[in-house]
Amino acid sequence: MKKLKRLLIDVLIMCLLFSGGYVYSYKKINHKGPSLSVIQKELRDTTKTLKGAFSSRKHVYKKETTSKTDSKYKSQAEMLKTLRHDLVQREKKIVLYIQSKKKLSGTLASDLYHQSLAYTGVANEGDYLHFHIKKVNMVTYLTIKDSQYYYKVNYTVDYRTSLKQENEVTKQVKAIASKVQGKTTVEKIRDLNDYVTAHVTYGHTDDDQSYSAYGALVNKEAVCEGYTLLFNRLLMEAGVENRVITGTAITRGEKESHAWNIIKVGNVYYDHDVTWNDSSLPNLYYLRGDDTFKNNHFADKEYTTATFVKTYPLSPTNYQNP
């Protein structure tokens, strides 16, 4: 019976393959966004996975007709711009249409997704956007007709914050950042570091807001991810280049998942842990050199590649005022 069922399925697939245009669909890909556990103060929080996992992919075929003149089909560059825009706008359902003269990568959906989260220098994009996405499901359909490839890519996205909450963050961040305009880079870092440590309390609730800039800024309570994302957003709004780094850190002899920033001053970057700066011994991890910082902070592999290290060179020594 099983053999007969399998034979019928194979026959059906072959019929679809030779019946003109057809859709080549990748099974849904489930990519869980980074959600960090926290390690400062009481270490009360549960550890969540840092790295997303992709499910195995299988192929199914479905007949579909598509006009090759359909204006909704754009280039990859246009679709990348659209995807980034829709993610910033917290769209939960995103559909992209891409036309190509040649077959594109089987990882098209995930490739576009990761490219949309790359560093751009815009305050609410890049790392800030990346770490505010909780989960995304991806499905890709391919229609082949008249030697043209028509891709339809569906994204279903779960965010840590809503557009309304992000609008409130933007409003408050702009007001705070405006107070440091005209100051030097180091003065901006100092003042914004002090703002975060003075206004945010370390703590954890069961909702996603503890892991967001909104939780840190509006609720005034967050874990390390919330601290780091708020600091990232404030610095970017003030014109100070920085990246969010994830990894592990050791405190009280225990290694836990953690997040911090690297901040550009001059031609090099310095490690900076705003969460740990909010302690009874403040600012011990302020613009630190990597030679000492790496004694208890260990970046994930993606931040230790030759390309990343070359792009973001870390100072081996602590920052010294000129």
Residue ranges and their predicted role:
Residues 203-214, 221, 242-254:
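Catalytic cysteine-centered active-site loop
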